[in-house]
């Protein structure tokens, strides 16, 4: 299954509990004002990768991690690709998977293709970013209207309190990557 992605980052400490390998899906039509990742919105940008190859990169022996984070863009706007990735991660006994979404939980439950993804993730942070709402750092949410859902026994709500909120990583080409959740 092909997935359009924006970026892969390994060794992140500001995208969920522990050291995480992160993928940002490409494409989002939600257009939340003040979005932290506007560069991920264009559905024609980014690059195509198979779910198997993406899984290989996220679980690379050269990039050990405590968890996988899927962000965007909007991962649920590619529900078939997201489901293929989540199933492959589960099949390979990946560490806990956290997914970020701008959809509400009710919206995800209301769409069969999106709902099918939920059993294959360990935690979900969802809801549209609201630049006028204060952050809820105790549950790792950029705006207080967003919710954290624990979907398996592999993570707990307490795992999301006190996390680093942002980081700057210099990649192999010398580019600075700002990552994490919106602080302003």
Model-inferred region functions:
Residues 1-19:
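Short, charged low-complexity linear segments at domain edges
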Residues 5-6, 105-111:
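Short gly/ser/thr-rich secondary-structure transition/capping motifs
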Residues 13-50:
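Canonical Radical SAM [4Fe-4S] cluster-binding loop centered on the CxxxCxxC motif
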Residues 37-49, 63-78, 94-108, 118-132, ...:
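Core AdoMet radical
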Residues 53-56, 81-88, 116:
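Alpha-helical scaffolding segments of alpha/beta enzyme cores, especially the outer helices
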Residues 78-90, 134-179:
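P-loop/Walker A phosphate-binding loop and immediately adjacent motor/lid segment at beta-alpha junctions
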Residues 182-184:
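Accessory C-terminal segments flanking Radical SAM cores
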